[in-house]
Each structure stands twice: as structure tokens, then as C-alpha cells.
């Protein structure tokens, strides 16, 4: 017997047996030690063979461990003396005899068990016989498992039953009802069957965008095969999906991955076309396992694919097909592309109706049909970087999951009552310590109040528990119906007509009646008095879309409607003297939120014109604060930074091959992250004329393609462009309003191309600030300063004399409101900062800022 011709698993078992003997203090390595290690190997051959005989490997392991416990033990250091016992040597010799009979090159773990059952003489063989293990049955299952192969190298474990180890049986999953139903997609499934039925190159590859349902088509094919709804050519075929991860995992040595793949391919080949292999993300095979001098997985597939020995279905995205498969012309010609297009909104609704039952069953809730329609339409409109039906299914799933969590959590009403009880109990404990009459009276009142609250809480809790149990019962009945439907389908496949009739016209009818009565019982409870909601509506879907994208698509609450109607008035408190501009901006936002605006264009695109300091940028800030409750919630792009033609790359991202390609553009990335936003392009006349070309598709169709070829959606943005063109005309008092408009229009046409101007919704002229509004602007600026002082613990008020002074001294018709801002900062701000730094004030102190004798002074 050659001990150098052992498989790696047997080598490992003998090494572990020696370590085990040393640890237990046994003087020798016995057959029990070896068998214990052989039976303990989780991915070994011996446990697999015992399982295939419908016996429990655990029972055999326990018997072996019991026998080990009876072994003699010695004290002291045994490591130097541990050798093989007679029984172990006999076992290895018996195993070697079996190896020779089976014409194997290497001694393996299955030979050990076969040797024991054939020539073993010890008590362990008797125990194993009692457990039902017989030599001839074991030999038969071993030969079946090998499929006519012999052990020619030291790692046979990875090559036996490769399909069971490295692939999943989709037919089995379909029989168990674990695959989701596939609705529609009949054309693609038919095309896949056509390609599979060819004599050679019968390998379809499903190509489509991520999330359009490529894997679902294969699952649909598995369902059709199981139901027998396929042509004769692929009837009774078994569909396996390759698990590349488990094939690569644990392949430590060079060539081990190739061995496993070869074994799997040989198994598929030897099935004589009975097995169809599905490889999801097939591009991962290109380059998989390739090291110096080794073939990659795709090259190992090529000969079998070309000869038609391997029926394979691949699935990959358009981008990856182009990047990996098309590069390799030899691999590409062996596959027949089947293009899977994105379904339309109507088709998506049909798909969702088919899946609805599965999601209702999983979450234990009901999904209204209006929610399915909303999921398809809203996801199509607002989630532009993903594809149907995946994004619509995700919306349904998340809305259902949110509702399930709400059912399982304590309702708000109950939670409030519980918190009230806790606070009353704390107060009661405090009052018990008081001795005065008032406290004792309060304690009596509190006890009554607490008793009422607890009673109310118990009533609410009983209602909640009842509603929960009713919803839970509904889920239970639905699960029962699903179970019996699967049993019915299985019985129908086996041809058990009586069983089918018993389930279809007996059990299922009873369960359906039970479901209807449970639904009626739940509906009887008035919706007003219900604590729990178990229906997913379109409003729930809209809320999820809003959470994902930040776009307010849910129905407007009364408060929001009132706020939008008052939008113009709110903006007027922030921007003074530009009422016409504020009205036009407010109307655009109101149209959008009411759903009247064109859905394929931005909410509003405005060109603000006017001299410096009249409130163009301030209007944009006020609008951002109104819409998003945050002044900084706008993307501001200063166009003076884009004076060169090449600087457009900074907006949309550098093209491939240039530095910064992976970083994306400043504009496109900002909008991708926040689709509902305000974008301010400040001082656009400073930019290079070439830069304006990218505005054309943004302003017209509400989209822009970035440097990576991705479409960025601008349909939910407000776009404001500001410019100083014609500011000298608008700031002049020489012209009438009509003349100003005409002159500004001429200058605009001179500076911008007609196609750019034609795409802007409104050109809004901001007029110079007059002395009549400067007082109001001064009030706003001083209020800002007062708020800053308040944060530092100083309560400031301003006298009318001071307001008159800053209004007069800060007014400049040419420069607008900015000189006023600078004056307030310089004179009033400096006076306050000196007062604070002197340390003269105490926290919360009231001070007045006044203008006296030509100076700004702080008066306590």
C-alpha cells in the first residue's frame, strides 16, 4: 500500500486523526479515529454517500464518538509515540483492496468506508450494520455517484456531483412554488425556446438593461418546463443555474477552479442534452480563473458550445455584453442574442398584478390595484436612472414592508396613552412623599386620572391585539391557500386526479370561504375606529417615491395648498420691490405642483435681468428656502468660472480618456443626487458662448447626457439664469418701461442665440431700487443682524433715527441694495461687536442701537 497516493481529503483526515488521538490521550490511531474524521468532513464524500442512502451521517458520527470514548488513555506526553493501531492498518489495507477493485489511482475517503463494510471485523462495523449501512448498497450508490469515472487525482470530491454542488436546480424550485410567476414576456420565452431547439449553437444570451427581467425569463421557462407547456424538444429537461461564487470559493490551488468547471461541464455533457445550464451575469466567465498559462472559463466553454454539447442560456446587460463578449468574436458567435426590452407602463402594471399575491402573502397585507398603477406610472416618471419593472416592484415591496412594520409597532394613539400613564406614575411617586393638603388632594385627583388612563389604554390595547390577530389570521389563510395550490399543481403533474379534485373542490373552496369571512369581519370594523391600516394605497407609493427622490409627488395636504397659494406673499417679505418677478416665479411653481405643467420640461426656466444689487440672486435664495426650507438647497453655478470653451466638461464631466472621467460633472452629479432642486446659473453673460449649447436640451426637454453617457433628468428642477445685460438701460430713468423692455430685448438678441432665448419660459426684468422701498430692505437687513446678536445672548432693538440714517446713507440707485448691506455691516455691526467684545453685557440683556450726533451708538 502506497501512502503517497492518498487524496487530499484522506490525508487531511489522517492528520486530524493523529491530532485527535494526541488530544484525547490515546496511545494509538485506531480505525475509530480515522472514521470519525472522515464522517466529520462537511463537504466530504462519505457524509454525501450516507445521505444518498437516506441515512443520517450524524447517527454514524455519534456511534463512532461513543466507540472512541471507550478507547484506553495514557498520561503524560503521548505525541512522540502515537502510531497506527492494528485495526487502523487493517482498515487502510482493506480500503486499498477496494481501490484496486475499482481501478482507482488514489486512495479516497469512500474507500475507507467501503473497506470497513467489506472486510472490517471490529464492533464499529456491527454498529454501522445496525444503523442500516450495507456493503452492496454502499458500493452501488458510490458507483452511481461517480458516473463511470475513476479517481485519477488527489481531489475527486470537487468533481463528484458537481451540478448539485455548484448549480441550483430551477425545476425543483419551480415545483416547490419558490419562483415568482412570470407575466407577459411570452415573446422572449418563445424566442429562447427556438434558439435552444437548434442543432448547434443552441445557446441564447438574454441581453437587456439591468432590472428589465432577464433572470425572470429563465425562471418563467423553468415554470413552463415543470408545467409541461413547452415543445417536445425541451420537455422534461432540467434547468440549472450556475453558482460561480461557490465554484470559485475554496479553490486554493492552481487548476482547482478549472477542475471543478470541467467536472460540471462533463456532467452536463454526459446528461445527453437533459440539462440546460443557465449562467447569470455570463460576462463574469470571461477572465474567470485565468492565471499565467491557464485558460479562462469562457475558453473552456467554447468547444462544447460550438458543437452543441452544452445547452447554455446566458444573461448579461448591454454594456457588459459589449465590453466582454463582443470583444471575443469566437465567444460571441457561439451565442444567439435575445434582446429583452424594458416593458411599457401598461405591461408593468400587468406584471405587478401577477406578483401582487406573492407580496401580499409575504408581508401579510393587501395591495390595492390603484397602488400597482401608481407604482408603474410614478416610477417611470420620477426614477429615471433605473428600469421597469424592477423599480416598480421595489416600490411595492418597500411600501408593503413599511406597512408591515407599522402593523407590528405600537400605534401612535396607544403609544401616547402609554407615555401619559408613565408620566402620571412618576408624578404619583413624587406626590406620595409630600405631606401638605394640596399635594394630598392632587394625589387623589391623579389616582382617578391614572385609573381612567389605564382603563383607556387597556381598551385600546385589546382593540389593537384584536386587529393584529385578524390581520395575522388573514396572512395564515393566504399561506394555507398557497400551500394547497402548490400541492394541487404537484398532484396534477403526477396524474393523481383524485388528489387534485380533493384539493381543488374541497380544501381550496373551504379556505376561500374562510378568507372571505375573515375579510368581511375586518371590514365590519369602522375605518374611523381602526388603529391599523392593512391596505397599501397609491398614497403610500407616492410617499416612498418622495423619500427616494425628494420630489413631492404625494397628494398635497391642506397646509401645503394654503402655503402654495400664499407663495407670492411669503416671497415678498424676503425680496422687496420686485413684485412682477415674484408673481411669475410663484405661478410657475403653482402650475407644477397642481400637475398642470408640461411633465417633460423643467418646472420653470427664468432669465433674471437687471442692474447689480436689485435682488436677482436674493429671489433665487428666497425661492429655495420656500420650496426646501433651506437657503442652501440650491445648486449655484457661477458662470464667470466658465470663460473657456473646454470648461463645459466641468459641468457634465470629462469625456473618456481625460483626467477626472470618473468624478462626474458639477451640474449633472448635483441633479442626479437631488432631482428636485433649484439651479442658479449666476451671471451667464460671463461664460463662453460654447457653454450655452448644453442649455438647449436642458431647457427644452429637461434632460442632459453626462460624460459617462447617462441621462440626467432636469424635469423636476427650477432653473434660474441671472444676467447684467442691459443693466445700464434698466437702471436709467431716461426711458419708459416699454422702451426699456425693447432695448433690453435688442441687447439679448445681440448676445444670445435665438434657439437659446426661445427655450426660456420667462425673461424677467428687475427694476432699479427706489428710495420708497429702501426702508423695507433696511428693515430686513437689520432683522438679520438682530437674529445673529440674539444667538450670542444679546437682545437688540433699532431706533427709527438709525433706520432713517442707514436708508439714506446706504441708498445708491446705481449699485442697488449692496451698499446698504455694507453700511449696516460696517457701522451697526462694528458698534455691536465692540460692545460684545468689551464684555459690558450680561446674557439676555436688552440694548438699543441709535443714531446720535452723527454716530451709531449702543444704548443699554
Swiss-Prot record:
Ranges where the record places region NBD2: 560-768
SUPFAM superfamilies per record: Double Clp-N motif, P-loop containing nucleoside triphosphate hydrolases
Origin superkingdom: Bacteria
Location of this chain's protein in the cell: Cytoplasm
Region of interest (Repeat 1), residue spans: 6-71
Pfam families the record matches: AAA, AAA_2, AAA_lid_9, Clp_N, ClpB_D2-small
PANTHER family in alphabetical order: ATP-DEPENDENT CLP PROTEASE (PTHR11638), HEAT SHOCK PROTEIN 104 (PTHR11638:SF18)
Protein name: Chaperone protein ClpB
Biological source species: Leptospira interrogans serogroup Icterohaemorrhagiae serovar Lai (strain 56601)
Encoding gene per record: clpB
